[in-house]
């Protein structure tokens, strides 16, 4: 898509991917701002209204991305408009993190926070799977049919889902825990200021424990397929790789819910620490097998990565949300999630491509995963029982 909007077909595959992933990363830089804005709305006026506004803004940005003329029609304005739309989309996505606060506040005494928190992650996994399937369909369009309208189909599908989401959220009731809180106390005037003044430690911990999740999520969902098909120089069939990737993402969704439920029994901290060690240990073998001309090895690589990644993904939402009391939870969780995303997640495909480019070593991206696995493990190790808030 970026090639259509920037008017260039880059022969250098590294330059092409770096450009594409740079546009992808732009939206992540806007997410913390969106988290602060919608966090203020969610903590002061209610979770429901914040979630409605965020999905409406998301749908607006998707609409404009869908109708942007290509470079041949409006020149330099095409990539400029794309970046603006990505920024708006990033702001909206920053507000979407509050879904987690909304979900776990339906739990009684926090007994199934891990399971409920995993549902939000499951929706993201399903969304990624749907996006991959739609992209696979658009690959069947060739020539002018793709240039003129084929590339717009994924955005049309996204807009359709956005409209459905707005309708569903209008019918949802406010979370019981927030309603009880609002009956007993007056909501804070500036949740963001209170967060930075009184909750620096849990805020920093939430950012750091989420880094390995954000890093791994975007490597699995965005980078792996491009790495296998284009950057690793394998001679495998692209269509088969897309099927393997889609199946892997589907399995990841199932395992995520399982590990979320498991964490309610054995502890979120314990599950995530073991999973972080697992990701550290498998990173180098995974990138090595994914660069081989063997479908069996590629499948093994996906399995090796997906199991520990799902174990991080399942409990992470609840583990982060429980670090904040209800009066700043929407703001605290949203900002932590999106700062972590901007630091470790959104730029992951770009950094991994750059690492291969400067080192000419196919397993170089493993160092990026291993770095964040260590950081998140250390952050998890210092969390104590007194840091946890359960409604």
Kindly give the residue locations of the regions a language model identified:
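C-terminal ends and interior cores of transmembrane alpha-helices
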Residues: 56-74, 277-292
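Extracytoplasmic gate region of multi-pass secondary transporters
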Residues: 200-252, 345-348
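Multi-pass alpha-helical transporter architecture, strongest
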Residues: 165-172, 370-391
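Cytoplasmic membrane-interface "Motif A"-like loop-to-helix N-cap segments
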Residues: 44-55, 265-277
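Glycine-rich segments within core transmembrane alpha-helices of 12-TM secondary carriers
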Residues: 93, 114-139, 161, 336-348
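Hydrophobic core of transmembrane alpha-helices in multi-pass small-molecule transporters
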Residues: 75-94, 296-311
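C-terminal transmembrane helical hairpin of 12-TM major facilitator-type secondary transporters
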Residues: 269-315
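Helix-to-loop junctions at the C-terminal end of transmembrane segments
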Residues: 35-47, 256-268
């Amino acid at each position: 898509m970026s090639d259509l909007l920037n008017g260039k077909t880059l022969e250098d595959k590294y330059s092409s991917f770096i450009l594409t992933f740079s546009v992808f990363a732009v939206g992540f830089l806007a997410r913390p701002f969106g988290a602060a804005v919608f966090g203020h709305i969610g903590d002061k006026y209610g979770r429901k209204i914040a979630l409605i506004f965020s999905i409406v803004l998301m749908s607006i940005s998707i609409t404009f991305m869908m109708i942007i003329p290509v470079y041949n029609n409006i020149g330099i304005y095409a990539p400029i408009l794309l970046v603006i739309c990505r920024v708006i989309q990033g702001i909206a996505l920053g507000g979407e993190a509050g879904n987690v606060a909304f979900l776990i506040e339906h739990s009684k005494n926090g007994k199934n926070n891990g399971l409920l928190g995993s549902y939000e992650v499951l929706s993201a996994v399903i969304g990624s799977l749907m996006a991959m399937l739609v992209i696979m369909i658009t690959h069947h369009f060739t020539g002018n049919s793709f240039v003129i309208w084929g590339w717009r189909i994924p955005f049309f599908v996204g807009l359709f889902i956005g409209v459905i989401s707005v309708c569903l959220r209008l019918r949802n009731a406010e979370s019981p825990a927030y309603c009880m809180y609002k009956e007993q106390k007056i909501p804070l005037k500036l949740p963001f200021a209170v967060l930075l003044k009184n909750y620096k430690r849990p805020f920093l911990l939430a950012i750091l424990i989420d880094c390995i999740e954000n890093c791994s999520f975007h490597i699995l969902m965005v980078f792996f397929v491009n790495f296998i098909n284009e950057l690793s120089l394998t001679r495998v069939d692209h269509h088969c790789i897309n099927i393997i990737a889609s199946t892997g993402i589907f399995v990841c969704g199932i395992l995520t819910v399982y590990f979320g439920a498991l964490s309610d029994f054995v502890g979120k901290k314990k599950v995530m620490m073991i999973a972080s060690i697992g990701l550290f240990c498998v990173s180098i073998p995974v990138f090595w097998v994914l660069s081989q001309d063997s479908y069996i090895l590629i499948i093994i690589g996906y399995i090796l990565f997906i199991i520990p990644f799902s174990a991080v993904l399942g409990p992470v939402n609840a583990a982060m949300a429980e670090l904040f009391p209800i009066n700043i939870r929407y703001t605290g969780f949203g900002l932590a999630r999106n700062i972590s995303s901007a630091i470790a997640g959104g730029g992951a495909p770009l950094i991994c491509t750059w690492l291969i480019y400067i080192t000419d070593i196919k397993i170089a991206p493993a160092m990026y995963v291993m770095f964040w696995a260590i950081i998140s493990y250390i952050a998890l190790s210092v969390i104590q029982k007194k840091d946890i808030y359960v409604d």
